[in-house]
């Protein structure tokens, strides 16, 4: 067992205001996920972030990026075969230097960077890459998970918690077969999640006791993790509820996309009436968590490009309004791409030309509404 002194008072030792009944210990950061290192296969991401993109974000008033990384992206190993446990610590420093450069570029534009292991040794919410072990079950996977966080914490040990945070693991869930995209998920047992989060946090704070650590909600980011409340770890929720709107016709979520009913907001969809009340209920535990002194941020949110645009905006306006009323920041999933403000590929948007990109001005205005 690790004492809660492990934390070093990271969330409350900064210049941020102390939590009160109506405040959130974390700043209300707003911004985007950048997917430059999201794929386990280097070179497969076409939409690389440039300094100009970062400048646009800052000019539009945003102050946050989340960097979801797949650990195989920055390893040296034989990619003609599945990865082996002995490969998992073979860091390719040419690639990690690129990641570091993107972090420092973002800092030059006043953007906080939250590093995230979207694919960690032994776990990812997405299939498509064969893991050699299981993070929730195998000690070797846990040790390698901590190795990676030790590496990143050492890289950024002199960077202030106001500029960088460490988001441990994207969307934890218990899935028996991690190589089946549509296998049933459930919550990770609380004690198991605590043990993993505590070990990684210890590795991160060994380099700087004031490092800001964030843990995604359990059950694919949806539910508060009471088992972590005493560890001085912030928690990250999601802005994807209900999935019938956010992931309408998303093939990686639903096997038979043609069976999905047309989304409405508000309105009756299948056997449910969808309205703001549903969101108020969904976010209530997260709001209460922030009122109890645990920092809360919405690390991912948005809508796939098959949802009718006006339905998306109507729903998202409610999501963002609830978050803002309780001082909870957010990061849209993507800056450019099917969830993004640029080049989203929607069939029902009157795009504005923005230096050769297609800008969804209505979405941008909604995101900027409370900046």
Feature map (PLM): residue ranges:
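N-terminal export signals
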Residues: 1-15
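Acidic/histidine-rich helix-loop elements
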Residues: 34-49, 78-91, 137, 244-278, ...
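Aromatic-rich peripheral "rim/lid" segments of glycoside hydrolase catalytic domains that contact
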Residues: 308-371
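Short, acidic/polar
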Residues: 43-58, 145, 279-286, 316
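Surface-exposed, active-site-proximal loop segments in enzymatic domains
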Residues: 41, 73-95, 121-140, 174-185, ...
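Catalytic domains of carbohydrate-active enzymes, especially glycoside hydrolases
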Residues: 49-72, 286-289, 326-329
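Active-site region of glycoside hydrolase catalytic domains
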Residues: 127, 135-274, 280-304, 325-331
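An active-site-proximal structural segment forming one wall of the substrate-binding cleft
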Residues: 54-63, 84-119, 123, 127-167, ...
């Amino acid at each position: 067992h690790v004492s809660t002194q492990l934390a070093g008072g990271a969330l409350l030792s900064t210049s941020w205001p102390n939590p009160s009944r109506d405040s959130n210990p974390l700043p209300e950061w707003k911004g985007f996920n950048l997917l430059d290192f999201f794929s386990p296969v280097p070179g497969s991401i076409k939409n690389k972030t440039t300094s100009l993109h970062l400048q646009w974000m800052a000019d539009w008033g945003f102050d946050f990026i989340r960097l979801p990384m797949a650990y195989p992206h920055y390893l040296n190993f034989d990619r003609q075969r599945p990865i082996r446990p002995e490969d998992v610590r073979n860091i390719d420093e040419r690639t990690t230097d690129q990641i570091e450069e993107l972090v420092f570029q973002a800092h030059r534009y006043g953007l906080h960077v939250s590093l995230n292991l979207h694919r960690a040794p032994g776990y990812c919410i997405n299939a498509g890459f064969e893991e050699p072990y299981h993070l929730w079950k195998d000690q070797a996977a846990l040790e390698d998970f901590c190795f990676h966080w030790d590496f990143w914490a050492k890289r950024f040990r002199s960077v202030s918690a106001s500029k960088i945070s460490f988001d441990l693991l994207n969307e934890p869930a218990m899935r028996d077969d991690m190589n089946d995209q549509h296998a049933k998920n459930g919550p990770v047992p609380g004690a198991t999640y605590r043990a993993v989060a505590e070990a990684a946090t210890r590795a991160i704070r060994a380099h700087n006791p004031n490092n800001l650590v964030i843990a995604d909600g359990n059950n694919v980011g949806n539910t508060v993790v009471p088992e972590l409340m005493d560890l001085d770890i912030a928690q990250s929720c999601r802005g994807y509820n209900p999935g019938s709107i956010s992931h309408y016709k998303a093939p990686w979520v639903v096997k038979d996309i043609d069976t999905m009913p047309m989304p409405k907001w508000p309105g009756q969809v299948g056997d449910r009436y969808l309205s703001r009340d549903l969101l108020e209920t969904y976010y209530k535990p997260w709001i209460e968590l922030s009122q109890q002194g645990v920092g809360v941020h919405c690390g991912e949110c948005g809508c796939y490009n098959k949802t009718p645009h006006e339905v998306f905006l109507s729903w998202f306006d409610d999501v963002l309004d609830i978050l803002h009323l309780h001082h909870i920041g957010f990061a849209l999933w993507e800056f450019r791409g099917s969830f993004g403000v640029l080049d989203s590929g929607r069939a029902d948007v009157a795009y504005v030309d923005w230096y050769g990109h297609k800008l969804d001005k209505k979405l941008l205005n909604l995101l900027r509404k409370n900046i």
